[in-house]
Swiss-Prot record:
Miscellaneous note of the record: A signal sequence is predicted but has been shown not to be cleaved in the endoplasmic reticulum.
Protein name as catalogued: Heparan-alpha-glucosaminide N-acetyltransferase
Transmembrane segments: 191-211, 276-296, 303-323, 346-366, 375-395, 421-441, 501-521, 530-550, 565-585, 593-613, 635-655
Phenotype upon changing A643T: In RP73 and MPS3C; uncertain significance; may act as a modifier of disease severity in patients with retinitis pigmentosa; has a negligible effect on the enzyme expression; moderately reduced enzyme activity
Biological role: Lysosomal acetyltransferase that acetylates the non-reducing terminal alpha-glucosamine residue of intralysosomal heparin or heparan sulfate, converting it into a substrate for luminal alpha-N-acetyl glucosaminidase.
Effect of P265Q: In MPS3C; likely benign; does not influence stability; does not influence activity; does not influence cellular localization of the enzyme
Glycosylation sites: N94, N142, N162
Species this chain originates from: Homo sapiens (Human)
Topological domain ranges for the Cytoplasmic compartment: 212-275, 324-345, 396-420, 522-529, 586-592, 656-663
Impact upon substituting L165P: In MPS3C; results in a negligible amount of protein synthesis; very low enzyme activity; retained in the endoplasmic reticulum
Outcome reported for the amino acid change (mutating G290R): In MPS3C; results in a negligible amount of protein synthesis; very low enzyme activity; retained in the endoplasmic reticulum
Lineage of producing organism: Eukaryota, Metazoa, Chordata, Craniata, Vertebrata
Localization annotation: Lysosome membrane
Record's GO cellular component terms: lysosomal lumen; lysosomal membrane; plasma membrane; specific granule membrane; tertiary granule membrane
Outcome of mutating P599L: In MPS3C; results in a negligible amount of protein synthesis; very low enzyme activity
Gene coding for it: HGSNAT
Length: 663
């Protein structure tokens, strides 16, 4: 970790009067200090609201079953579960109740509970079971002896609800069996804390932005002074993961004549804000996201909030690579020395990543036989190296006349990079070829499924198809992630790593799409309309590609959206979202100045420190503590929000002290 030191420009300004310096400090603290105070106050209000007695989690009051039921039939409910009581009035017929989630695509039914036959007419037998409330459930009741379906129903149970399913004969001329579902006690609204947290957070951001806007209008001169003084901070900020920077230890080289300093790119707050949004969401979901299913990774196909953050981080890393590299080359750095710096940074990212994903300091000596090799930072390191080297090899000066060209149909930002695009298309062709043509022993060629009980249990050990096979072949099962998200619904038993080798190809593609966004920002600087037109075009084109690949379906498309595979449709979909976010952030943050990016801007400026720190200190106080009710979404959500807010606070303090971790 390095602290920023005073530059020559700062020393020259040191001779200003004490009154001017005091005015600058007052201006800085009046905006940022009040923003921070508002943030802390909002966090306190949120914690109090969510933990207040009689809040939204009425589990203790509503989970109790009716008094006339035998205690042995009661299930100890956990988070995201409901109690289902099955009453069987059928004489001479034992029942087997099967269950599966409606989100489990082509899955085998799993035995839920067996219900004995009724001992005599009018006296039903009963059995109790807990059912998942995360998604809709499909229940099928079979005659145990004949294995014949008796009835079938689909229902979305509510958390901590109490339900009864009565199976009985109906005599309407023809003997029929009916299955009637009744609600004994209503479920709780476990999503209410999320709604409260979102509204409070949105209100805090709006209030802070409004206050800062008022401050800038009331004291314009102080605002200018603050902007000038903060420029030195921007010059000293490291380009972690390729973030654009004003200084570099390599700037002592002789400047080539082909690079013009007049094209030096400005630092864009929207880029740092976008990085901060992705990072803070990543911290929140990694800490648990309140244990809500939509803040966890999808079991296989589809998208949740947790599936958005990593590709966005990769995308904005690509944008920063181009902006940073252009700045460094324009200041005269030789390509050879820059290549060495790229290689060293990539090596450090991979090493730090391996250390983070193998936290063995509390479990005794680390066994090399069990070391996990892939991981988030490892993939970032490889992706950064490939994309940065690709841009370095074919780097060209930004043409001056492009910035003044008035045609909105100009494709100079694309045509100037045709060698890079050609190599990216080759890489994508390699991914498609390996995914759909590589023979995998015991599995169908081109298989994209989760294995386990998916596809009706035909391919239990084929998780991930070619992607899983390549990882197991080259790295070995013991060096992969042992608890993939597919195990939740599909009960997979083989190791599978979502940050595996084959998926890295598509992360490179996504980072290069981020490079394209960076080129748009630089090639058409000061031409907001042209930038927004191109962002819109890329958003629509990538979105249409996603529509074609997925057939607007979660599971039935040619290439489903899948985070575990980092499928092509996953890349195009998330890149489309990323261009849309930049389409919103760039005019709001950089052009109009309606929002400063607070509070996401601060962690976006110190991304490596925040990411590594939140991983290392995850299980330490004050980021985690023992909860009064471990089965309460409300308490988990409060803990995770507080922990995330603390990292925002840490990033803010480090920014104020001009401390940034660079690698």
């Amino acid at each position: 970790m390095t602290g920023a030191r005073a530059s020559a420009a700062e020393q020259r300004r040191a001779g200003r009067s004490g009154q001017a310096r005091a005015a600058e400090r007052a201006a800085g603290m009046s905006g940022a200090g009040r923003a921070l105070a508002a943030l802390l106050l909002a966090a306190s209000v949120l914690s109090a609201a969510l933990l207040a007695p009689g809040g939204s989690s009425g589990r203790d009051a509503q989970a109790a079953p009716p008094r006339d039921l035998d205690k042995k039939r009661h299930a100890e409910l956990k988070m995201d579960q409901a109690l289902l009581l099955i009453h069987n009035e059928l004489l001479w017929t034992n029942l087997t109740v099967y269950w599966k989630s409606e989100c489990c695509y082509h899955c085998l039914f799993q035995v839920l509970v067996n219900v004995p036959q009724s001992p005599k007419a009018g006296k039903p037998s009963a059995a109790a079971a807990s059912v998942s409330t995360q998604h809709g459930s499909i229940l099928q009741l079979n005659d145990t002896l004949e294995e014949k379906e008796v009835c079938r129903l689909e229902y979305r149970f509510g958390e901590f609800g109490n339900y009864s399913l009565l199976v009985k004969n109906i005599h309407n001329g023809v003997s029929e069996i009916a299955c009637d579902l009744a609600v004994n006690e209503d479920p709780v609204d476990s999503n209410l804390p999320v709604s409260i947290a979102f509204l409070i957070g949105l209100a805090v951001i709006i209030v802070i932005s409004f206050l800062r806007l008022l401050l800038s209008l009331d004291d314009f001169n102080n605002w200018i002074s603050k902007a000038i003084s903060s420029r030195e901070t921007d010059r000293l900020i490291n380009s972690e993961l390729g973030s654009p920077s004003r200084t570099d230890p390599l700037d002592g080289d002789v400047q080539p004549a082909t690079w013009r300093l007049s094209a030096l790119p400005p630092r864009l707050r929207s880029v740092d804000t976008f990085r901060g949004i992705a990072l803070i969401l990543m911290v929140f979901v990694n800490y648990g996201g309140g244990k809500y299913w939509y803040f966890k990774h999808a079991s296989w196909n589809g998208l949740t909030v947790a599936d958005l953050v990593f590709p966005w981080f990769v995308f904005i890393m690509g944008s920063s690579i181009f902006l940073s590299m252009t700045s460094i080359l324009q200041r005269g750095c030789s390509k050879f020395r820059l290549l060495g710096k790229i290689a060293w940074r990539s090596f450090l990212l991979i090493c730090i990543g391996i250390i983070i994903v193998n936290p063995n300091y509390c479990l005794g000596p680390l066994s090399w036989d069990k070391v996990r090799i892939p991981g988030v930072l490892q993939r970032l390191g490889v992706t950064y190296f490939v994309v940065a080297v690709l841009e370095l090899l074919f780097a060209k000066p930004v043409p001056e006349h492009c910035a003044s060209e008035r045609s909105c149909l100009s494709l100079r930002d694309i045509t100037s990079s045709w060698p890079q695009w050609l190599l990216i298309l080759v890489l994508e062709g390699l991914w498609l070829g390996l995914t759909f043509l590589l023979p995998v022993p015991g599995c169908p060629t081109g298989y994209l499924g989760p294995g386990g009980i998916g596809d009706f249990g035909k391919y239990p050990n084929c998780t991930g198809g070619a992607a899983g096979y390549i990882d197991r072949l080259l790295l070995g099962d013991d060096h992969l992630y042992q608890h993939p998200s597919s195990a939740v619904l599909y009960h997979t038993e083989v190791a599978y790593d979502p940050e595996g080798i084959l998926g890295t190809i598509n992360s490179i593609v996504m980072a290069f799409l981020g490079v394209q966004a960076g080129k748009i920002l630089l090639y058409y600087k000061a031409r907001t309309k042209d930038i927004l037109i191109r962002f819109t075009a890329w958003c629509c084109i990538l979105g249409l590609i996603s529509v074609a690949l997925t057939k607007v379906s979660e599971n039935e498309g040619f290439i489903p959206v899948n985070k575990n595979l980092w499928s092509l449709s996953y890349v195009t979909t998330l890149s489309s979202f990323a261009f849309f976010i930049l389409l919103v952030l760039y005019p709001v943050v950089d052009v109009k100045g309606l929002w400063t990016g607070t509070p996401f801007f601060y962690p976006g400026m110190n991304s490596i420190l925040v990411y590594v720190g939140h991983e290392v200190f995850e299980n330490y106080f004050p980021f985690q503590w023992k909860l009064k009710d471990n089965q309460s979404h409300k308490e988990h959500l409060t803990q995770n929000i507080v922990a995330t807010a603390l990292w925002v606070l840490i990033a803010y303090i480090l920014y104020r002290k001009k401390i940034f971790w660079k690698i």
